[in-house]
Swiss-Prot record:
One Pfam family it belongs to: Palm_thioest
Coiled coil: none
Enzyme class: hydrolase
Primary location class: other
Enzyme active site: 97 (nucleophile), 214, 269
Family: Belongs to the palmitoyl-protein thioesterase family.
Top-rank taxon: Eukaryota
MF annotations from Gene Ontology: fatty acyl-CoA hydrolase activity; palmitoyl hydrolase activity; palmitoyl-(protein) hydrolase activity; thiolester hydrolase activity
The protein's name in its UniProt record: Lysosomal thioesterase PPT2-B
Keyword Glycoprotein belongs to the record: yes
Tagged with keyword Oxidoreductase: no
Span of the signal peptide: 1-20
Glycosylation sites: 143, 192, 275
Amino acid sequence: MRGYLLLLPLLLCLVDNSVSYKPVILVHGLLSSSKSFDKLIQFIKKAHPGTDIYPVDMFNHLKSLNPMWKQVYEIRKYISPIIKNAGLKGVHLICYSQGGLICRGLLETMPEHNVDTFIALSSPLMGQYGMTLYVQKALPLVNISALQEVCYRKFFKEISICGYWRDPHRYEKYLEYSAFLPKLNNELLDSNSTERKRNFLRLRKLVLIGGPDDEVIAPWQSSHFGFYNEKEEVVNMKDQMVYQKDTFGLQSLDGRGAITIYSVPGVLHASWPNNQTVFKNYIEKWLT
């Protein structure tokens, strides 16, 4: 018995060292870069030593205005080997702001992905409408009336933000000219709609984080799959057509208890990836 007791510390050490965390892939937002995740990377390394972390260093700053589908396809080339190497263990995605929409595109177009948890950090998942700082930085010389005309013209519709600009008063124009979000939502059906939904449902867990003091995402409830109706009243996720008709799998995911939603007050948009409280309370637990 004494011999076993002497071996116990060694055995515990071996068990502790055998803990292996899933790789984490980070995708940044509009007019930003992988540097926006510097503090978040520190938080993850401290909480889960040994975690392999892959901040996507692509489409930085003004290049983030490139067409959304172009960003999805190029980033997919980068993360595919990471996902493949992870094997059955799987990976986690943390995707911030515009990056959350890019990650939706990745999930829907990768039939063999093994993403365990997708954490969407203050992302305009159901679109953007309103001249917040987010829009003003991207298109500083354009007001909201002009932006509606810019985004709903063939020449400009490939600008990233126009791909998910969603005017609640002009839904038909949104369907016609927004090159990204209607397809992502399967609001416009095509030969790949069924496959996009099937791919999205490979996801094990969806974590939605946003808050009322964001001041950039408009409406802020878009980070929770809510959006304006034609009266500019916010319609929550479960009352959205894409949820009720389960167009891309949102209702199915929710039905199996796979969606967690956090509404966090007091956090400005630029602070989400740098906020240690946000990490400790709403992110860390999902990165096992």
